[in-house]
Each structure stands twice: as C-alpha cells, then as structure tokens.
Amino acid sequence: MTNIRKTHPLLKIVNHSLIDLPAPSNISAWWNFGSLLGLCLILQILTGLFLAMHYTSDTMTAFSSVTHICRDVNHGWIIRYLHANRSSMFFICLYMHVGRGIYYGSYTYTETWNIGILLLFTVMATAFMGYVLPWGQMSFWGATVITNLLSAIPYIGTNLVEWIWGGFSVDKATLTRFFAFHFILPFIITALVMVHLLFLHETGSNNPSGIPSNSDKIPFHPYYTIKDALGFLMLISLLLLLALFTPDLLGDPDNYSPANPLNTPPHIKPEWYFLFAYAILRSIPNKLGGVLALVMSILILAIIPLLHTSKQRSMMFRPLSQALFWILVADLVTLTWIGGQPVEHPFITIGQAASVLYFTLILILMPLASLIENKILKW
C-alpha cells in the first residue's frame, strides 16, 4: 500500500517540502538559519497571541497593562521576555541568513532573493511597531523620531507623517494602529514565507561550492531534519539563557519609565538590531539625504545580483572577495556600535567613515575584486 503522505493532497505538499525533498549533500550549518527563522516566527506568533489577550492599546493603560502581564498573569513575565528576546534572536538569524546568501551567491536565485528582501522590510516594520507598544520613554520617542523621518519627503512629507500618527503627534490613534499592524503583519510574513519557499523549491537549494548539485542529492528527512532539530535545540537554549538570566540585557532602561512627551531622553535610539541603519542615517547632515541612505542601506541588497561579476557563484574559492566580505561584516559591527553612541566627536567621524565604506564595499570593491579574481584565473 502506498504511504498516505505520498497520496493525500495536503500531506503530499508537506512530503515534497520536508520529507522527500531532494537536498544537496554538502550544505553546511549556514543553511540552518532558514528553519530557525521559521521556528522564531511560529513561536513569536504564539507568544504574541497570548500577550495580545492581556495588552490594551491605549496611551493611559498600555504601560500598566504590560506591568500587569509581568506581575499578575500566570507565567506572563516569561511570555513577555521570551517574546522580547526572541525578536533579537530573529534578527541575529535573519542577518546570518542574508550574510550566507551573499557569501555563497544564493542571490542568483533572484525571485527567492527579492521575496527575501521584501520579508526583511516587513519583519523590520513589525519589530519597530512592536517596540512602540509597551509605551515606555524609548518606545514613545523612538516612534516619534523614526516616523518623523517621513517628513523629509518633499511636498507630501508632513501630511504623510500626520496621516500615520492619526493626529499632530504620536498619541492614542498611533498606538492603536501600531498594535493592529503589529498583530496582522506576522500573518502576512507567514504568507510571504510560503512564497519564498515556493520559489526556492522551484530551483532547489544552493550549496557551499556554488556548483549545481543535481547529480548528488539526498532526502531532506532524516539527514536535515536531525540537523535542523539540533539547531532548534541550540537556539532555544540560548534564548532561555537570555530570557531567564539577563532578560533586559538587550533592552533599554528608559523603557521602564512611562512615556512622557514633555521629557526627552538624552539619547534616543532604536533597538540594537536597527543601530547599523540608524548610524548610516545620522552620518549624513541632511535630513532627506539621511533618509535615502537609510533606505538604500537595506535596498542595496536588491542590486547585489546585478553586481555579480565573478565567473564563480560562491566565495568559497575566492580569497579576495572573502576578505572584503569579512571587512563588510566588521564594518556593520562598527556601525551598530556607533548607532548606540551619542552624536559627538569622534563618533560622528567614525560613523561617516564606516557609512562610506559600507556602500563602497558593496558597490565598487566587491565587484572589482571579482573581476581581478577572474583575471588571475585567466577566465
């Protein structure tokens, strides 16, 4: 008798995606981050659902409702801290996933790559709106500063900001709509993930060597299901370690003070995973220029496939490109550090230098290094 997973219309889809899927035999741990992101998304939706049952999106009660969740709701504190810290894990996995795509040339699957960029933007928007919900000092001022950036758009900027705010400042209307969007966006992300996987399974997965692996495939189960399970275990262990021992390590102390529109914090900054983009924004003295640089710092990923000049797909055998890639990683770490520092000398200069280097590496140096490598190999 034929196995039900191969005949049942629904189980057949699961079977072709998770069990009998032909996968390259040599994919490394860098390919684990996709499944880890899926795990993060599912767990974020679950914890978020339980938090939404007790949260109230009103400026008068939002802060106290979060306090109520932590103090009075059964296991509310752990649900809240898991939700907050898993967003950090989400972005760590996300950046590693994108980094792996750049290093091993996965961006040559343009459909999958472009849906991935759309996913990145959507996840960033969701995380930003989630950061506003506890209605602490940094939540309020972060929302004010970041939404205000849209006022740099010529002609329609001011109207656009007031339309998003639902008034003349960040207030009750803003909080209510941010909560509504924060609730609905993860489900839109889930739909986009399905499309992302659909495009990926059209081409099959890339592998570290960048060479087509059609002649050497193995079934996804049990080989990669076990490998993913180990990744899940490590991620959950790290998350529990963070949420149970140092739950506020990645948060901002200002968020323990209720939002006060009359008192500005000395240093307004977003969550740590947005600091690299925030540093690029601040490094340009002009408001519109800064906003364009901020958007381009992420949107630049969309033109990476067009800048691929190498005859090889992966960086595995390209030492020059490897060196530049790791300089890019170090540059992003520097930008993240600068984004968390006050706007004063020498941080301004370091931020400007790191921002220029970021764009120079991606737009000029990396394509140039690929051409030099082609020349060395006489290709």
UniProtKB/Swiss-Prot annotation:
Which GO CC terms are listed, alphabetically?
A: mitochondrial inner membrane; respiratory chain complex III
Residue numbers binding heme b b562: H83, H182
> Which cofactor names does the annotation list?
heme b
Q: Describe the family membership recorded for this protein in Swiss-Prot or TrEMBL.
A: Belongs to the cytochrome b family.
Q: How does it sit in the membrane?
A: Multi-pass membrane protein
Chain ranges passing through the membrane: 33-53, 77-98, 113-133, 178-198, 226-246, 288-308, 320-340, 347-367
Name-wise, this protein is Cytochrome b
Q: Which residues bind a ubiquinone?
A: H201
What more the UniProt record tells us is: Heme 1 (or BL or b562) is low-potential and absorbs at about 562 nm, and heme 2 (or BH or b566) is high-potential and absorbs at about 566 nm.
- Sites where the protein binds heme b b566: H97, H196
State the UniProt keywords alphabetically: Electron transport, Heme, Iron, Membrane, Metal-binding, Mitochondrion, Mitochondrion inner membrane, Respiratory chain, Transmembrane, Transmembrane helix, Transport, Ubiquinone
Q: Does the keyword Oxidoreductase apply?
A: no
